[in-house]
Amino acid sequence: MHTPPALPRRFQGGGRVRTPGSHRQGKDNLERELSGGCAPDFLPQAQDSNHFIMESLFCESSGDSSLEKEFLGAPVGPSVSTPNSQHSSPSRSLSANSIKVEMYSDEESSRLLGPDERLLDKDDSVIVEDSLSEPLGYCDGSGPEPHSPGGIRLPNGKLKCDVCGMVCIGPNVLMVHKRSHTGERPFHCNQCGASFTQKGNLLRHIKLHSGEKPFKCPFCNYACRRRDALTGHLRTHSVSSPTVGKPYKCNYCGRSYKQQSTLEEHKERCHNYLQSLSTDAQALTGQPGDEIRDLEMVPDSMLHPSTERPTFIDRLANSLTKRKRSTPQKFVGEKQMRFSLSDLPYDVNASGGYEKDVELVAHHGLEPGFGGSLAFVGTEHLRPLRLPPTNCISELTPVISSVYTQMQPIPSRLELPGSREAGEGPEDLGDGGPLLYRARGSLTDPGASPSNGCQDSTDTESNHEDRIGGVVSLPQGPPPQPPPTIVVGRHSPAYAKEDPKPQEGLLRGTPGPSKEVLRVVGESGEPVKAFKCEHCRILFLDHVMFTIHMGCHGFRDPFECNICGYHSQDRYEFSSHIVRGEHKVG
């Protein structure tokens, strides 16, 4: 190794700095000093080598500099300097041992450098002592790149964690990963004290305190804190639609869906549903002379077709309840068709009406004759009864009423509505308006089939749903006095087989113009009032007992216990349940 005999500059040193390609200023100054002719054969060797390791620290200024105080740790001898930071005593020279310049090849340099130092830079980056680097594990993006926390360099250039073996793409990723082992969270929120391992997470957290939502939708007022949330929101605007989030809309009913496939499935069902409504309406309007039945659930827009889209279709998209998407929306419209007395095929006022207005038991105190059944039920549980078809009986009280002293014959065959929409409770019955009930059919129909009579218990529900009638208005006011007899109509021959012997002498009366009648008489031969439950096929001579019994039948299902809700299969099971009194309420 060649060492220059003397240098025109004085070097003082106590520290050791390795500069494998940086500190360009010190290197240039050294080359400038050596280019004075002292060692002409040294510079080519210096230029060809990759690294210089100097034993002394180059000093440019006189006095105690900051670098000398920080790194040398000892006072430096006096020196004379000029304003251009060059020494004025070139006669002073250093001995051969005062400065030592060593040159190594690439292989020797890589052997001398530790594995941690080789991880930082591949190009000629600065490698300084640990005292010059920033604190480990903190990076705010403003200073130089932090020192790598350590790892194993793989042949593909990636770093491997020496704790768990996780492979990271670079030193920064490895540094953040090592914080999961050390538990270090250098980024802290000044407002709530939350700490984070990365600065980006802290910045996103600060937006929670400020309420800032920097990502805004250009099409609507939607704003969010994260970019990925905005990206998902923008997909809703891919197809222009007034319904945000559901861009696929049905042309028939206006309902919107998120996916095209779901819309296609719905349109097929919705179109078939509307076609069925149209077919039913055409069949109904084509037979104006038939009996008035099956008239409900027909919207006005179907009765009066027009070229425009029906107005009721807009209501299909505004369903009030949740339902499966596979079920087409149901029309929600007028539940009752109202008719005046002139539209009915028979005269309601022919033989009188009620003695007084129909009223609920809740309006009166319970009499002792009612027994324990109604007392157990309570007046709050009393509802309008679902009475049997009146083809078999012409006089039935349509609601649970108070004890009548006299019962009036009802010439029209009436029944309470089968749904709650028709009005129930005292507020619907006592407001002064006409009472609405459904008519079964024409009284004067001479061709009534015997099957329209008292049906068996197994087909009670289906027959009730099949026979849907219109709505009639009952007159109010005191009607004339009734005749002393009660006429019970019969149509079913099977009923006569079940009861071959009439109770207390059932005398066959003269058949009327359109049906056979039975008259109940007592032992002395005088007529006796009788009340019949069509569901259980039981005759009651006392109206109070009949009312109590009818109160046990359910509103929607006649074989559902109105006390506890128990469902029976037939009238025998229902009667057994009522007799045993096994009611489990709640």
Swiss-Prot record:
Residues 476-485 have a biased composition (Pro residues). A zinc finger (C2H2-type) spans 159-181, 187-209, 215-237, 248-271, 531-553, 559-583. Residues 79-98 have a biased composition (Polar residues). Residues 281-586 are annotated as: Interaction with FOXP3. Pfam families: zf-C2H2. There is a cross-link at K100, K501 (Glycyl lysine isopeptide (Lys-Gly) (interchain with G-Cter in SUMO2)). The modification Phosphoserine is found at S105. GO terms for biological process: negative regulation of DNA-templated transcription; positive regulation of transcription by RNA polymerase II; protein homooligomerization. InterPro entries: Ikaros_C2H2-ZF, Znf_C2H2_sf, Znf_C2H2_type. Residues 1-42, 68-98, 413-490 are annotated as: Disordered. One of its GO terms (molecular function) is zinc ion binding. One of its GO terms (cellular component) is nuclear body. Keywords: Acetylation, DNA-binding, Isopeptide bond, Metal-binding, Nucleus, Phosphoprotein, Repeat, Repressor, Transcription, Transcription regulation, Ubl conjugation, Zinc, Zinc-finger. The N-terminal zinc fingers are involved in sequence-specific DNA binding. Belongs to the Ikaros C2H2-type zinc-finger protein family. This is Zinc finger protein Eos. It comes from Mus musculus.
